[in-house]
Amino acid sequence: THSSITTEKRIMDGNDVKTCTQTRPLFGQAAHVANLSLLFKSTKYGWEGQIAGSYTGKRLSDISNWYDDDIWEDGYMQLDASVEKSFKNGISLFAKASNLLDTPLLRFIQNGPRTENVNSERNNGNVIERKEWHGQSFMLGIRYKL
């Protein structure tokens, strides 16, 4: 969505705190989101498979009361895959993998006058507030249908 909102923010003017307005995107709404899923199914041979990818663009993560001090979450990509083999006796074997790319969650404060003197790790000039990896997960299993 490309919706926005204008809110009051605080700003330092020398030693005084003043109020101004700032227009920003809606909280948590990415301007760009994409999903793609490829499926394969062979009922004759009992095979099913899927690869699914999704992209979520940069979005506002935490809103500050101060001008140009909001925390943003960088865009990220996720890739998942699954495969299943079914047998005529009702038994199925399956494997699933999630978050194959293990793209880190990157939260940052956008580069600007308030961050120019901050001595911290940066990404594209922005001050990194948090970087975390959620890891990949894998599952193997057996299923029996009566």
Question: What spans do the regions from the language model cover?
Answer:
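C-terminal beta-signal and adjacent terminal beta-strands/loops
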Residues: 55-63, 85-146
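Extracellular loop and loop/strand-boundary signature of outer-membrane beta-barrel proteins
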Residues: 15-25, 65-70, 80, 125-130
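Generic, ordered loop/turn and secondary-structure boundary motif
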Residues: 27-28, 77, 101-102
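Residues that define the transmembrane beta-barrel architecture of outer-membrane proteins
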Residues: 30-34, 75-79, 134-138
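Short, intrinsically disordered/low-complexity patches at protein termini
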Residues: 16, 71-73, 115-119
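Transmembrane beta-strands of outer-membrane beta-barrel proteins
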Residues: 36, 47-51, 81, 93-95, ...
